[in-house]
């Protein structure tokens, strides 16, 4: 009888340990390199300068996720500020732009709380704020000045997968597509211009995560 009781306790412990971080009421965060790859385009004067280019940039990405149920999560994406070089085919690099694109997602996780591999999809909203934008010497020599960008709201979509190492630790990969449309305000030769700009980036992130 004693051996049976010990075995039952061991089995209970094993089964209780099979629940992982992705279950109702859990909170976890991920951290890792996040790369923004714009699929850019522009109208107005910028759109006529033989192409409009925005460089890729990689920063520290952070996500914070709360599991409302075993399958439904709410996630906030944050990051250190992204720094992009902006240029055209006619001028080369002409400016540097800094931005932050915090994104709030509603997610559906496939599988259940005992699954070690949890693919997921998400939809949500992105807010992008621009700051510390300035023309470099190339831009200034071309008569450009007073650069600013209008903050943007847009939709976002996401796919990803987590591999749960144990109850507390996980590794994962995720991809977002963000609708980021803004207006570039600047002066050329002292004349004010307002050009529409489309960034619409893909964001790629590889991460390690921890449950709190």
From Swiss-Prot:
Keywords from the named record: Cell outer membrane, Membrane, Signal, Transmembrane, Transmembrane beta strand
Subcellular location: Cell outer membrane
GO cellular component, one term: cell outer membrane
Biological process annotations from GO: transmembrane transport
Recorded superkingdom: Bacteria
Pfam families noted in UniProt: OmpW
Membrane keyword on record: yes
Family: Belongs to the OmpW/AlkL family.
Stored NCBIfam families: PRK10959.1
UniProt protein name: Outer membrane protein W
Organism whose genome encodes this protein: Salmonella typhimurium (strain LT2 / SGSC1412 / ATCC 700720)
């Amino acid at each position: 009888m004693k051996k049976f009781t010990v075995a039952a306790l061991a089995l209970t412990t094993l089964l209780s340990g099979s629940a992982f971080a992705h279950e109702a009421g859990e909170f976890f965060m991920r951290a890792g390199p996040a790369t923004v790859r714009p699929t850019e385009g522009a109208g107005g004067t910028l759109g006529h300068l033989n192409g409009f280019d925005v460089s890729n940039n990689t920063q520290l990405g952070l996500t914070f996720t709360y599991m409302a149920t075993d399958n439904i999560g709410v996630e906030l994406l944050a990051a250190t500020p992204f720094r992009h070089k902006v240029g055209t085919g006619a001028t080369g690099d002409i400016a540097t732009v800094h931005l932050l694109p915090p994104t709030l997602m509603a997610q559906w996780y496939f599988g259940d709380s005992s699954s070690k591999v949890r693919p997921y999809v998400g939809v949500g909203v992105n807010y992008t704020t621009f700051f510390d934008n300035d023309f470099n010497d190339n831009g200034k020599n071309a008569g450009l000045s007073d650069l600013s960008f209008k903050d943007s709201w847009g939709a976002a979509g996401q796919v990803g997968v987590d591999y749960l190492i144990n109850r507390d630790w996980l590794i994962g990969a995720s991809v977002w597509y963000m609708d980021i449309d803004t207006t570039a305000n600047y002066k050329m030769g002292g004349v004010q211009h307002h050009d529409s700009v489309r960034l619409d980036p893909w964001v790629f992130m590889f991460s390690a995560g921890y449950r709190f």
